[in-house]
A protein has these predicted regions:
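Conserved class I S-adenosyl-L-methionine
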Residues: 71-81
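Short acidic/polar alpha-helix capping motifs at helix-coil junctions
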Residues: 51-52, 75, 176-180
Length: 241
């Protein structure tokens, strides 16, 4: 129950997911019935969802914290979920400071997690819609983990532009998602995930590798690096300002 890999919350949330799958035919016919990108989740549903997301994120967060240097960095974590990534990095690097931004019902849980880990002096979560009210401070790193597949292309374009603008010179963007190959029928996990996004988000889209690289280049990012061997079916992209 108390394991950091505990999946019980996600199992509870799966009931909500299955209710959406039962009407998948309507989504295919473009009669969209789905969550408005998770904005209408109750706090309990959000908490269950984040428990599962936290269990899935732990190996990736530990990988990133051990692989990359964050000494004295100020980090922005967008759509931070349970806060697993920023909390893990902050526990590894005692000089890290950072901010999480997320939906109101999620931000409350993030601040509870920050307090539980005794990190209130260095971390905070702020409730905001990143498509409307983007932070203005400057950051050494921006985390964008499991977010882009929740947004249509025009939102991702704006989001990447905003991230580029708040990054310090040579600042880094860390981005993960489940990407498709150009044929859009592989790899298998990403195809299955694309169907889940169709059933469970209003505007979600699973991008191809070439699509996300083009979006990054169009927002003026450079040194784009693709990393496939993270402990997840997801792919990690790192890009510099």
């Amino acid at each position: 129950k108390d394991s950091k890999f505990n999946q019980t919350g996600y199992i509870d949330f799966a009931q909500t997911v299955m209710e959406k799958y039962n009407n998948l035919e309507n989504a295919i016919k473009d009669n969209n019935f789905s969550f408005n990108n998770f904005k209408d989740l109750t706090e309990k549903q959000a908490e269950n969802f984040m428990k599962g997301m936290q269990a899935n994120a732990v190996p990736q967060a530990e990988y990133i914290a051990s692989k990359y240097n964050f000494e004295n960095h100020n980090i922005l974590d967008i759509g931070a979920g349970a806060g697993t990534y920023l909390i893990t990095v902050s526990k590894e690097y005692k000089t890290v400071r950072g901010k999480m931004i997320d939906l109101p019902q999620v931000s409350k849980i993030q601040n509870r997690n920050i307090e539980r880990e005794h990190l209130k002096d260095r971390l905070v979560s702020v409730s905001c819609d990143y498509n409307i009210d983007f932070p203005k401070e400057n950051y050494d790193d921006v985390f964008l983990f499991a977010v882009v597949h929740q947004e249509p292309k025009e939102n991702v374009e704006k989001l990447l532009d905003n991230i580029y603008n708040v990054l310090k010179p040579n600042g880094r963007l860390f981005l993960t998602s489940f990407f498709l190959n150009d044929d859009k029928i592989s790899p298998e996990f990403s195809v299955q995930f694309a169907i889940e996004m169709l059933a469970n988000s209003k505007n979600g889209k699973v991008y191809t590798h070439n699509e996300i690289k083009k979006l990054l280049k169009d927002s003026n990012f450079s040194n784009i690096e693709r990393i496939d061997d993270i402990p997840s079916p997801a792919t990690l992209y790192i890009a510099n300002k």
